[in-house]
């Protein structure tokens, strides 16, 4: 007999696992909606699922914020039921041969800045900005960027008094070393400026294909972090952003000039990239690089590329810079399984003929609002008390895989909850989610995974008539 959690969510096959517990595909038996179900043992050494669910509730209502369906205790487990989302930026990056065009980066940057700003308005720092923590939506939200993984989020000010947390030093590094700010490496308490600096590194990673401090070798994690910190501090932003528009240098110079408690001028940062977008003659048509790879005819009409796209080749042949931890070897069949579930959902939801939408409910008509979103309005909207939150399989996996979490999630305990489920997969990686700690990176997908990607994207609705 299949197990049901929350009274209506039937558990299916396992999607992934980690020190936090395991993630399963689920379905709402009343509506047929597919969901992701995250299970955490009640006796976990560092339980965090309850904390994460509270973050979802506090952030609910914002554009690009996933929605939680249900949270509660079922048997020996904390359970969180979340909507499925599409692939992560890291997965799309691999799909695009680890290189994004300037147009794609600028379209993503505008939404990503909005997401970070929204979290800050709500009083929280994300503290783990990286490609794996930004996902695309499904169906009518297929071109909307979602920010996920609130396991390391921290409240930086009191929402009533607006009192900022105090400046501190000698802090351990929290987040992912590759994208951490210089001040974070130096042990300084993080604030809003650090999320934005991390986002800048993310954008340059997309443009360059890698960052100068990737692939450094060291004997211990501390030595590795020290080497990354030194290389990052000794790399001038002008060198980091060389051969790319000066707006990226301006971005770094601004965010690094902010003091600990300063409120960033998010509008200035978005305006930098919006003006560049217009000057390059791009159209905000939601035609991303991954769209062009599947539908080349859209490339000629969208002015999508500031440079020739690399030839699509098997991802296993793409050199992937070493992670901030030891890289995992390619996993063959596991990679096929890792991709299949998400693309099944991606195909079904995006091939329904409903079209896709991003932040705007209608196509922009003026240059001023060509990249604008509804985030500003959502930031002023009061929180609803309903527990209607959502995330992806990756959200649940990535948000909880922290180095400090080491719950013993045994197969015997799991079998009592889901006696008939296939538990053959023991990999710590899940669909479109890093399941190692925040400082890990994923191996490039296999040729089989790429084939699944191509097949599933065939039904993606991208016609202009479908965009509203």
Curated annotation (Swiss-Prot):
Coiled coil: none annotated. Keywords: ATP-binding, Cell junction, Cytoplasm, Kinase, Nucleotide-binding, Serine/threonine-protein kinase, Transferase. Autophosphorylated. The active site is at 128 (proton acceptor). It comes from the Eukaryota. Residues 9-278 form the Protein kinase domain. It is an enzyme of class 2 (transferase). Signal peptide: none annotated. Residues 383-393 have a biased composition (Low complexity). InterPro entries: CK1_Ser-Thr_kinase, Kinase-like_dom_sf, Prot_kinase_dom, Protein_kinase_ATP_BS, Ser/Thr_kinase_AS. GO terms for cellular component: cytoplasm; plasmodesma. The keyword rRNA-binding does not apply. It is found in: Cytoplasm; Cell junction, Plasmodesma. Residues 324-335 have a biased composition (Basic and acidic residues). It catalyses: L-seryl-[protein] + ATP = O-phospho-L-seryl-[protein] + ADP + H(+); L-threonyl-[protein] + ATP = O-phospho-L-threonyl-[protein] + ADP + H(+). Its EC number is 2.7.11.1. Monomer. This is Casein kinase 1-like protein 13. It comes from Arabidopsis thaliana.
């Amino acid at each position: 007999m299949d197990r049901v959690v929350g009274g209506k969510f039937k558990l299916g096959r396992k999607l992934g696992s980690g020190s936090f517990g395991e993630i399963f595909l689920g379905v709402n038996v009343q509506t047929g909606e597919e969901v992701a179900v995250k299970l955490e043992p009640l006796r976990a050494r560092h339980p965090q699922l309850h904390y994460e669910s509270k973050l979802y509730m506090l952030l609910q209502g914002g554009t690009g914020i996933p929605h939680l369906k249900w949270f509660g205790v079922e048997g020996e487990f904390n359970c969180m039921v979340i909507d499925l989302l599409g692939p992560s930026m890291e997965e799309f990056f691999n799909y695009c041969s680890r290189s994004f065009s300037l147009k794609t980066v600028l379209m993503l940057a505008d939404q990503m800045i909005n997401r970070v700003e929204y979290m800050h308005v709500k009083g929280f720092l994300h503290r783990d900005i990286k490609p794996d923590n930004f996902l695309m939506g499904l169906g009518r939200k297929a071109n909307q960027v979602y920010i996920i993984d609130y396991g390391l989020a921290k409240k930086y000010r009191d929402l009533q008094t607006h009192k900022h947390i105090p400046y501190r030093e000698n802090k351990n590094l929290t987040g992912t070393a590759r994208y951490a700010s210089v001040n974070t490496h130096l042990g300084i308490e993080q604030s809003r400026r650090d999320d934005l600096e991390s986002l800048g590194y993310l954008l340059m990673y997309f443009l360059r294909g890698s960052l100068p401090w990737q692939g450094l070798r060291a004997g211990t994690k501390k030595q590795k972090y020290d080497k990354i910190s030194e290389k990052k501090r000794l790399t001038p932003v002008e060198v980091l952003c060389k051969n790319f528009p000066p707006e990226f240098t301006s971005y770094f110079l601004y965010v690094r000039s902010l003091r600990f408690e300063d409120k960033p001028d998010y509008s200035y940062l978005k305006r930098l990239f919006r003006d560049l977008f217009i000057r390059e003659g791009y159209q905000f048509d939601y035609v991303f690089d991954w769209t062009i790879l599947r539908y080349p005819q859209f490339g000629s009409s969208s002015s999508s590329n500031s440079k020739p796209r690399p030839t699509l080749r098997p991802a296993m042949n793409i050199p992937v810079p070493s992670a901030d931890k030891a890289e995992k070897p390619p996993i063959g069949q596991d990679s096929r399984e890792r991709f299949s579930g998400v693309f099944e959902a991606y195909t079904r939801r995006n091939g329904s003929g409903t079209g896709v939408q991003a932040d705007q409910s209608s196509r922009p008509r003026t240059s001023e609002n060509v990249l604008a979103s509804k985030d500003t309005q959502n930031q002023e909207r009061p929180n609803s008390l309903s527990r209607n939150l959502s995330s992806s399989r990756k959200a649940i996996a990535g948000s909880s895989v922290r180095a400090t979490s080491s719950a013993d999630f045994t197969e015997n305990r799991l079998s009592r909850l889901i006696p008939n489920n296939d538990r053959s997969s023991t990999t710590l990686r899940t669909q479109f989610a890093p399941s190692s700690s925040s400082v890990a990176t994923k191996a490039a997908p296999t040729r089989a995974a790429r084939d699944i990607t191509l097949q599933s994207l065939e039904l993606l609705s991208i016609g202009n008539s479908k965009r509203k």
